């Protein structure tokens, strides 16, 4: 049934839909509905969903002849078919407009700085292969990973999820290979996501965790190198590559290369809420992945992480072929029943619902108005939790000095605090500034210093080196060149 997160444009309502005339008129006359060639009904549906409830009448009222007889494994890639590019661009535009109206759209510059990772890892990268009952393909996958050529250390972590078909026996050939770690969880309730979580939290996992499904292959000797380079070059917390659909004998199947070129730096993470997948292979910074954790499911676990990562961090993209996705009779999603499709779609809609709500809360927190009483309470609260700053404020009365400067028509009394020489005596030449971390950025601030977000892009901080009884610092939330015009609205 329809949820807040039912944002995919292929949501199947059936052919019979009843819409209030007043709702259509409201949509057409609201002054912000652009003209659409393909996305008109989709945009109307999103608009109505933001104003009221969409009800599913659970009663068969008509029948129709199904004309699209393709299996689910073929239909699921319609949105990346180049022939549908113009349609998809319109759908993306309609979805972005909807997200803006409901307060869930994230601007492209609203990205967290990547935290420093001081963890000591056994290797730089780990290829993660969850497996259950893939005796026919598991060794192909492991050998594909081992054939990678890289100028850094890497290993292969296989999680055998209680296979019963000879998979465990097939993996015995790697028992003496230090580069291959076969893990056997004691729990019997783990899905693919649970196996991933088990692997990335193990002592063997490297700095980057990189996907390889148990029936797939890497397309060349260098995907690991390309992925790790993308983390560094694109300053990303997650990297997604491109893959080609092939049969078991590696012959190309439609639609061929799936590169997700619809992704843009400007709107990719918003459009991710509309489409049903983000691509493969997927790779993660292990430290951040351990903080978020994998959902313990065997469907949509990767999509859930992509949404969560994109809420806070930049997702890097590689648009050249890295991966071969083999379609064969053993695939779990090659030809799903309508009941399974509905169940999977409902789960992803639920993921999107949670993500929309999380983004709405984030945007609301950023955009709440400036309030003098709230700032005063924040100031007092901060000093109760920051002993060093509180002591400086308590000593302020005895430390502050004044100096009288004579003027032609009177005098000017200047107040200053000698203890601030620690912060004001720093070098300000170009080289020194470039080498010094920005003390206003969240990752470089003391753990005890908190920020109060206000007015969209501004934060309020308590200054730890005061010259005033209530000394505040007001930077932008993101690291940008300071510009007085950004703060002009504060003076109104």
Positions of predicted regions on the chain:
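Conserved donor NDP-sugar-binding/catalytic core segment of glycosyltransferases
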Residues: 1-4, 222-255
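A recurrent flexible, glycine/aromatic-enriched loop bordering the glycosyltransferase active site
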Residues: 2-18, 261-283
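Acidic donor-binding loop at a coil-to-helix junction in glycosyltransferase catalytic cores
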Residues: 35-44, 298-305
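Short, acidic, metal-binding catalytic loop of nucleotide-sugar glycosyltransferases
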Residues: 143-153
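A conserved acidic beta->alpha catalytic loop
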Residues: 160-169
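Short beta-strand-to-loop acidic/aromatic patch adjacent to the donor-nucleotide binding site
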Residues: 206-217
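Active-site microenvironments that recognize anionic phosphate/pyrophosphate groups
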Residues: 360, 364-481, 485
């Amino acid at each position: 049934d329809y949820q807040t997160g039912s944002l995919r444009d292929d949501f199947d309502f059936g052919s019979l839909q009843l819409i209030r005339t007043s709702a259509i008129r409201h949509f057409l006359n609201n002054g912000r509905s652009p003209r659409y060639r393909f996305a008109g009904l989709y945009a109307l549906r999103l608009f109505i969903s933001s104003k009221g409830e969409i009800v599913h009448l659970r009663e068969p009222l008509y029948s129709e002849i199904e004309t699209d007889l393709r299996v689910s494994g073929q239909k699921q890639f319609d949105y990346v078919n180049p022939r549908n590019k113009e349609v998809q661009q319109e759908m993306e535009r309609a979805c972005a407009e909807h997200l803006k109206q409901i307060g869930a759209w994230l601007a492209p510059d609203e990205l967290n700085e990547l935290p420093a990772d001081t963890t000591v890892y056994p290797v730089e990268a780990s290829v993660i292969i969850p497996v259950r009952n893939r005796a026919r393909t598991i060794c192909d996958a492991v050998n594909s990973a081992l054939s990678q050529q890289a100028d850094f250390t890497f290993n292969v972590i296989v999680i055998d999820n209680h296979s019963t078909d000879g998979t465990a026996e097939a993996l015995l050939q790697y028992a003496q290979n230090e580069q291959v770690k076969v893990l056997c969880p004691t729990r019997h309730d783990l899905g693919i996501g649970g196996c991933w979580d088990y692997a990335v939290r193990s002592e063997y996992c490297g700095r980057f965790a990189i996907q390889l499904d148990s029936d797939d292959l890497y397309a060349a000797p260098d995907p690991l190198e390309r992925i790790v380079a993308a983390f560094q070059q694109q300053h990303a917390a997650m990297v997604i590559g491109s893959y080609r659909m092939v049969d078991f004998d590696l012959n190309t199947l439609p639609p061929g290369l799936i590169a997700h070129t619809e992704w843009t730096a400007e709107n990719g993470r918003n459009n991710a809420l509309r489409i049903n997948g983000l691509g493969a292979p997927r790779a993660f910074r292990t430290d951040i992945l351990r903080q978020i954790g994998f959902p313990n499911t065997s469907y949509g676990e990767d999509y859930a992480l992509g949404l969560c990562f994109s809420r806070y961090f930049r997702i890097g993209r590689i648009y050249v072929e890295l991966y071969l996705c083999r379609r064969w009779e053993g695939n779990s999603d090659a030809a799903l029943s309508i009941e399974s499709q509905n169940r999977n779609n409902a789960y992803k809609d639920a993921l999107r619902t949670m993500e929309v709500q999380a983004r709405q809360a984030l945007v609301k927190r950023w955009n709440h108005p400036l309030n003098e009483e709230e700032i005063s309470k924040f100031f007092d609260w901060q000093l109760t939790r920051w002993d060093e700053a509180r002591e400086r404020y308590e000593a302020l009365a005895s430390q502050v000095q004044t100096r009288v400067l004579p003027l032609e028509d009177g005098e000017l009394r200047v107040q200053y605090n000698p203890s601030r020489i620690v912060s004001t005596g720093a070098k300000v030449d170009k080289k020194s500034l470039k080498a010094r971390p920005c003390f206003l950025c969240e990752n470089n601030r003391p753990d005890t210093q908190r920020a109060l977000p206000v007015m969209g892009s501004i934060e309020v901080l308590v200054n730890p080196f005061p010259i005033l009884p209530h000394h505040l610092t007001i930077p932008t939330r993101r690291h940008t060149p300071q510009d007085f015009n950004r703060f002009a609205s504060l003076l109104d």
